[in-house]
Amino acid sequence: MMFSRVMQLALICAVTCEDNPCLWERFTNSRDIEFMIPVVNLSTSRRLSMSQRICMVSMGKHWSRIFSEGEEDRGMKDLDPLLMSSLNWRGTAKTRSSNSFNFDILDGIFLGFLDLVKWGEEADRHTPIHPECIKSKVCGFMTASGPRIKTCTGKFRGADRHGHCTNRATPHEATNVISVGVQHAQEANQVDEHEARYISEARKSINPEICSIDGVEINQCDLASPGRWLMLHYASFRLQEGSLVYLSPGLNIKWSQINVPASDFYCINVSDHLNTHYRPCEVNCTDNCQGDELYCSVHQCARSAECKCSFIGSRGMAEVQIGDRWFKPAVVGSQQFFVKEDVPVLQQPSADCTTCSMTCTAEGIAISSIKDELKDVTVCVEGFCSTRVSKGSKVWKIEFHNQYPSSGSVALARGTTVSGETFELTAECGRRTGCEQINCLFCREMLSNPQCYPYGKWFLLFLILATLYIIVALLKTIMRIFMACLSVLYGPFIIIIKISRCLGRLGKRKGERTYVRLMEALDDERKPEVVRAPVSLGRTKQPRIVLFIVLALLVHMALCCDESRLVEETSVTCNPGPDNIFSCSTKEMITVKELRAGKTICVSLKGPGGSLSSPIKIKMLDIVGRSDLLDIYFTFNGHANCKSVRRCRWAGSCGNSGCLGVGKEDYDRELGDQESSLHPNWRDCYDGCGGAACGCFNAAPSCIFLKRYVTNADSRVFKVFKPSAWFLSTKIVVETTSHKEDVTLKSGEAKVIDKVSFHYRTDKNLFAGMSIPPIVTEVKREGKPLSFFLENQGQHPKCKDENSARTSSASNCIVDQNTISANVRVDDVSCRSNLVSISGMSTLKPLPQRVGDFLIQLHNDEPVLLATGDSGVVEGELQIDLSHKKISIKVDTTVCRGTVKELKGCVGCTKGAFASLEIHSTSAGSASLQCSLSSCYMEVQKGVNNVNCSLRFSKAVVEETCVLACSGSKEQLSIKGNLIIGGDFKKLTEDSATSFSHTDSKDTRIHLQTGLMNWLDTLFGASLLGKILGIGLAILSPFILILILRWILRVVLRRSRIRREPKYEMAKYS
């Protein structure tokens, strides 16, 4: 019964409300209006007109008083469940008790049309609208949506099969109202076709990421989101057919008061004070009404009249700014709309590239893709890594040139193809070691290692000496030719000089004779002629030229290898315990001066009888440059928003005192957008123009309300690192029998792990004076993030965490208010954004980036510096203090015997030498092999064990006796073999980078052999006498060889002459 009466009232409203400002049907009809299609999932609601859907008056605090007055004697008890104390409608009694949603939702929509005074009294002939709606001229409306999931608690207990709550259910606090908004309607002219096209294009540009609003397409999208409710401001414009609605997150509105219409005055009957809310004047007032000063200035007023009219403080006529133009809309307001946004086409979860492959041969590394082109590839081998962004290529080849990875080296390649497929490939670069690593002819590696070709070295030596002899002879011949040319040119040169001198003397004599004749003519005296003897010239001596030739064979510096440190029994103190387990300690400080990334150092103590403790393993994960970070914060691509409204004096929130009396809540009321307060925002009020020229009744300055706020433009988040001082640091993993921990040590820092102290010292001036701008990396869940330098540190937001940056939180983000500058004009405000584009800087200096001799990149979410070229070897050391550590050693009688099967590797290089041993042990335990410069810790099992032992030697030709020791035995082993000098991988590509490494210059001089000394040892042995004789023989050998050749030629020529002489004599006598 109630529903049918409400429906009748609603239908009457649609045709009889001529002065109702909420009726959009004065300008448009429901089939042409945009963005207001029904969002209620009820079939009955779809037949409602636009006015019936949106015209629920914005009463707020008035509802309770109106209903209480109406309940006394007007039969309103049945409407009590619809009572609402605020705009946040919590639902009705029907929602909580009934299994039907239809009636209460429609009641909520039609609530604004119920005329309480005329309830039941000829409703079809009276306007079913409350006077408060006419007084405010601002209508609020709701968009209902229901049912919403379930309204029952406790895992849906008390719900029927349709999902509705029954009487047994514990009621939820249902909230069926999705959106609440306000709107203002006014007289407006139609916009022409050109203006409509301009507004339509501006709507697309201001909402680039919105696909549709309430089902109306805004932009074409390949993939749209499921949708969400979003508060938008809108302005509706009249077209010749239908309407056009402009929407944006905010609107700049300018209100003016021109030609005050009668509807801007609220007239009531003053005779009956009890019914002021229900008895407005039946018709618009004329001269027979009384009113306020403004009303009487427009109309003639009577002092005694039952009707009194007052100015209701109307906003006036609204103009909205679209682009750089101002338009007068028919309706302006704000509402939550159901918006579907564009979803960027994300790459599908990376699939493995099944057509990608990698090979590692003697020539180099080749990475290829059969199906798609390579997008980016990172290749690492022997600690060197190179990155390449491919340009339309399916193959990337890296040549080794005159180098080859050592035995067991594995090349690793990671990257993606243009189709988004990822690959992670490995390839073993052969089992070559020692002399097999040399893959060039007449190169430095070959010349430095004569031990690798025992027979060819003599031939090579002869070629070298012969080449030197030829060079000397060639230089001597050139000098002879030069001197011969000088001797040929000497004669003509002397002749020319003599002729010039002769001519000079002749000229001088002639001049003297002329002078003498002149004097004789004057003095009549004749004197005898004087003849001078010529001056003889000496011959110039020819210069002597002395030639000095120096031969030097150089090899490059190399790194050390993995090593074991054994603390001898004399430095260890042990106390016996049960089961032959001794508790031992040492005061000795172990210093390791040769360090590299990937190196493992084993430290063991020798107990009674030579028994070894379980080693303390120190794994060097990296040695890179790190920085103390001044600041770490999150930022985003900020979008500057500026929203302004101009209000004439005495209208709305612009009171008598103008901007001085404006409060915080006034901005929200005037600008109509509370969601912007969730973002960093600033509120300002400026004095604007007043008077008739600006469309205002009062000449006092108007109020221009302005809100500036910053939002995240694209939901992307970036993390910013601001480095200060840089220093070398190492990350190590320490493993003992009972503990394992990783720690980062920076230069000069000491830390304790499981009672073992580690002190790291390096060259602190390596990065002195280095200045690096802030580093930015994009926070991404999938895919490769952008990393780059923040060169232009202009205005940008700074947030505490990722979520605050993604939502542009006002509480956790700091933004300088100068990021949005405001320029106040006569009746509006123009804004300019000073925000910098964070993502736009990614193309200027992307990481990795070369900085001097170093390469900076992000590694494990922190900026690090890597070495390039020859900058990677620096001095440094790691000190290990075991004085506070008790180490257990089990003493047993393990007996082991062994033989050396093979010795391969290099000397003075990163990986060092490897001795392959075959050890037979009587029981499981530990064994050690100790040589003159290094030692090796090994774990053995009962029986035969094939183990590899890492050692260091000082010579390429090794012939040394080492000691193989177990807890119950010691044995001498002879190690012989040829190693190569160097053998380290120099560089993968020109732009490759690697971790830093440390080496000791003193130790380097001990175990690094120059190529010349290696040649002497190889050719003539290690004794001094052998080297002296060998050097002398090498110097004299060319001359001796030439003498022998000459002697051979003479013998051959002599024999040929002897053979020819008998034939000549026989021919003579015949």
Swiss-Prot record:
Annotated positions for site Cleavage: 560-561
GO BP terms: entry receptor-mediated virion attachment to host cell; fusion of virus membrane with host endosome membrane; symbiont entry into host cell
Annotated transmembrane regions: 458-478, 1024-1044
Region annotation (Fusion loop) ranges: 648-654, 690-701
Keywords, in A-Z order: Disulfide bond, Fusion of virus membrane with host endosomal membrane, Fusion of virus membrane with host membrane, Glycoprotein, Host endoplasmic reticulum, Host Golgi apparatus, Host membrane, Host-virus interaction, Lipoprotein, Membrane, Palmitate, Signal, Transmembrane, Transmembrane helix, Viral attachment to host cell, Viral attachment to host entry receptor, Viral penetration into host cytoplasm, Virion, Virus entry into host cell
Keyword Zinc-finger annotated: no
Superkingdom to which the source organism belongs: Viruses
Keyword S-adenosyl-L-methionine set for record: no
Cytoplasmic face residues: 479-536, 1045-1070
Signal peptide stretch: 1-17
InterPro entries cross-referenced by the UniProt entry: Phlebo_G2_C, Phlebovirus_G1, Phlebovirus_G2_fusion
Propeptide, residue positions: 550-560
GO CC terms, sorted: host cell endoplasmic reticulum membrane; host cell Golgi membrane; membrane; virion membrane
Similarity comment text for this entry: Belongs to the phlebovirus envelope glycoprotein family.
Other notes: The sequence shown is that of isolate Human/United States/1/2009.
Identification of the protein by name: Envelopment polyprotein
